[in-house]
């Protein structure tokens, strides 16, 4: 489930985000990227339907290209759910993303949910479906 998942952020140092738990590493990154909000996004396994590695990589590359076009700074990340049959989902921690934009990107890539984090550095699960 989304709430039990570990959301790895591959910064230096790397750290794990948990829904509902404040993360001080995130505050440091907010300062670095001059941001006060962020989102955790993936294009893997749309509508929770398991896709092949190649399909997932292709969709995630499209998301990455879009983030670059939007000039949205991001760090590579990965969502891992301990009780899921899915392998980890490559993701992006994207800085400066307003909630509406995070939802739009999640919907564009047919995700059931996204994580959104405001200035309090507490990740929130935002259900889209």
Which residues does each PLM region occupy?
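N-terminal, charge-rich interaction modules
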Residues: 1-65
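A generic "folded-domain core" signal
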Residues: 56-57, 117-122, 129
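Amphipathic protein-protein interaction modules
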Residues: 57-101
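Short, flexible, glycine/charge-rich loop motifs used to bind or transfer phosphoryl groups or to couple energy/partner
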Residues: 29, 82, 104
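Short, compact, well-ordered microdomains
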Residues: 86-91, 95-124
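Short amphipathic beta-strand/extended segments with alternating polar/hydrophobic composition
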Residues: 18-20, 104-105, 126-129
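Mature, function-bearing regions of proteins
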Residues: 65-68, 123-129
